[in-house]
């Protein structure tokens, strides 16, 4: 469970950062 959650975070973080840095 936690493994998949960390995977989702790892996938979501880059997109969030790119949105903030836009």
Curated annotation (Swiss-Prot):
Q: Which domain of life is it from?
A: Eukaryota
Tell me which tissues or organs this protein is expressed in: Expressed by the skin glands.
Please give the name of this protein.
Answer: Brevinin-1OKa
Q: What does this protein do?
A: Antimicrobial peptide. Active against Gram-negative bacterium E.coli (MIC=12.5 uM) and against Gram-positive bacterium S.aureus (MIC=12.5 uM).
Sorted keywords for this record are:
Amidation, Antibiotic, Antimicrobial, Secreted
Q: Which residues carry this modification: Lysine amide?
A: 22
Instruction: Give its localization.
Output: Secreted
GO process terms (BP): defense response to Gram-negative bacterium; defense response to Gram-positive bacterium; killing of cells of another organism
Tell me the lineage of the source organism: Eukaryota, Metazoa, Chordata, Craniata, Vertebrata
- Organism the protein comes from: Nidirana okinavana
GO CC terms in record: extracellular region
Q: Which family does it belong to?
A: Belongs to the frog skin active peptide (FSAP) family. Brevinin subfamily.
């Amino acid at each position: 469970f936690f493994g998949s959650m960390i995977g989702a975070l790892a996938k979501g973080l880059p997109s969030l950062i790119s949105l903030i840095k836009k």
